[in-house]
Amino acid sequence: MFRNYLNLPEILTQVYLNKYAILLILILIKLILLETSILDNLNSVLLDNSICDNGEIQPVLNTVHYMIVDSLQTLEAAGIVSIILTLKVIKQLALFFIELFFGTYICLLNAALKGSTEVALDASEGVIRAVNATVVSATNDIESALKGLSSIINDLVTGFNAIKNMFTGSKSDPTQYQNKINITLGDLKSKIMIPSEVLTKLDNFKNSSLYGLSQLGNGTQTIVSTPFELAIKKLNTMKSSYNFTTGAPSPINFREECLKDMSKLKDVQTDLAKLVEKISKWLFIGLVLAMVGSILYVSYIQWRHWRRMDKFISETGIDKEVQFRNQYNIYNNFLIYTIVKRMGIELNERTIWMLSFMFSKISRNVFFFGIMGVVSVVAQYILLNSVQSSMNNHIKSFDITSNSTSMSASTIYLRDMNTYIDDTQDKLNQELFSGIKEISVSLNSTIVEFLDKLNETLSDIFGSTPLAGPINTVVYCTIGRKLEKVEKGLTWMNDNLNINIPSISRDIEDGLSHMTFLQPQSVLARANKIIDLYRKSILLELYISLGLLGVWLFQIFVGSATLTIRYWNSTRQGNNSYAISSPHELSEQEKQVYGYPLSHPLIDGKDLTTSSSFYPTTEEKSK
């Protein structure tokens, strides 16, 4: 009878595929991959100079640097502006006090002297103009008479000349005497009249006689204000051309500072790599020894199980061991039992042996590990493919949204911040100086109104009397000039009393504009890279699962080779020798031919037909 079950040597050929060895192999593969990944990551992370090429850090460092420098520049500029304003205030106060005390006396003295000289000069000018008018009038009358006389004489001369020409036949110019008379009168007129240059000199003297006195006050103010003007001019020049960044340190260069530490990281990477390789080597040796131990353990378990089965067969008195083991193999293997017993499909003994070899307890572990791995890979691939497809759709939608956005976040921030600075400046000036400006405007209005009413009152009282001019002069010198200076001071204060908060500088704007912020599509792109990494790990799982299935399929080759060897051995033994076949029950004819075996009737009271250990004698047969 052909043996369809696996004997002990055939079982031991599969002990290297036990579940413990498979798990240890998977752990070993995991360890090897982890070691490779750690070494690669150490090289790529610790020794990768691209870490120092992070374009997101340098703009931040530049922005912080420019914010500090800009704050110092603002402080320096504010100091210069405050000094300029202080000098202007001191200058105006000094000029105001000069005007308050010294300007009054100069104004009154100027008015008094100017009034006296103008009276004298006006009188002289009146006399000269009267004399000239009289002389001109007289000379004009004389000139008219002379013109009449000249006409008569010219007529007589013309007549005489005509008579003379009748006798002499010559001609003469009739206007020669007339020209002589006219010229003589013109010279006489110019000699008698007072020259006009005298009046011009009087006017110039009147206008310039008090020039030095009027310049005395202006010179005093100029002497006082000149140092202030020079200082203010220098400060304005400094403010417009001063290089605030002189001496300021350069921004931190992230790449240079990062590369300085790369040599230290290289030493760290070398030490870590040696540590990983050393520990991995010992773990690898331990796992290999554990696999060898699992093979020995499973071999012992299979040998013990086979020995117990032999003991069971011998103790129960089973004389048909091959037949018993064949039946036991069919019932013990779930696949063969399902095909033969449940489905009723007849299989020959060699097919049953091959199925037993392919789906033994050891071999089917490899098969199920491989199948479950492939199923897991398919499920993970479906999940990752769905997630990646959805993520790509989201990336496209974000790209469309970002393209439709006209301004970046930094541009919006700069615009809003400048608007906030302007609003804060207006609000601060409004809260701090609005009351003062209202008071200054009110005082200016009051001063203007007071001066208008004062002039109207003086005009009503003195009108066009001779006292109107001196009174107006005295009032202007004592009151009007002071009020005008106060009015100018209030106007200057109203124009300059404000706080100017500087806007964000161009350097800070450039730094913020170069900063890259977190974008949804960039995050999704990174997640997409992670999915690609998972895809690679899934492919590795697929390779491992296919490798397990390949090992299981390799059992077909081993089983076929084993069957071939068994067939070759059985053929060779059949041709060379004969062997006693397995015992089986005799048929009725065989019992008659060989004699029916009987058991001894006195042994255990067994039925006489159930034992072949006692044969009857001839005498018993004859009976």
Swiss-Prot record:
Transmembrane segments: 20-40, 93-113, 282-302, 366-386, 538-558
Extracellular topological domain: 1-19, 114-281, 387-537
UniProt entry keywords in alphabetical sequence: Cell membrane, Conjugation, Glycoprotein, Membrane, Transmembrane, Transmembrane helix
One Gene Ontology term, aspect cellular component: plasma membrane
Signal peptide (UniProt feature, chain positions): none
Highest taxon of source: Eukaryota
Positions of glycan attachment: N132, N182, N207, N218, N243, N403, N444, N455
Record flagged with keyword Hydrolase: no
Cytoplasmic side: 41-92, 303-365, 559-623
Induction annotation: By pheromones during mating.
InterPro entries: PRM1 (IPR026777)
Function in brief: Involved in cell fusion during mating by stabilizing the plasma membrane fusion event.
Family, as annotated: Belongs to the PRM1 family.
Name this protein carries in UniProt: Plasma membrane fusion protein PRM1
